[in-house]
Amino acid sequence: MTEGSSTEMGLCTWMSDLPDELLDFPVICLAIPGSHDSMSYTIKRGARLAPDCLPILYRLSPYLGPIVRRLSYNWCITQHATASVQLLNGIRYFDLRVSKKNDVDGFYFVHSSYGAKINEELKTINEFLEDFRHE
């Protein structure tokens, strides 16, 4: 890691580094850093519109499909950092929005458009928790 990195600053272990007097606090009493639409970075340009998309975009989609998807993409990406990077930077609360596709098995992350299947990203989170057991 480089000087000033999240590992050096302790962001990836901030929960493990809490003082003993805070360890007995209910988690609801702590301010926990989180990210909004945490997995939106998995959405690719031109992705299919998701059920949480604005109704007007659904109505326009049959006529202006590529333009509508480009417009949706421009505002649906609220995170550029991967789940792994977010965790290493101290994020401990993920805003996960999930939906199914009508014609495909599995669950996908969404924010106006469909992103990745949830399995791989959840594996990444699990790997972090295996490496940092007290987080």
What are these model-predicted stretches?
Residues 98:
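A cross-family signal for N-terminal binding/gating loops and helix N-caps
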Residues 1-89, 102-120, 124-132:
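Long, acidic (Asp/Glu-rich), low-complexity accessory segments flanking structured domains
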Residues 92:
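Extracytoplasmic glycan-interaction modules
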Residues 135:
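Active-site-proximal binding-pocket segments
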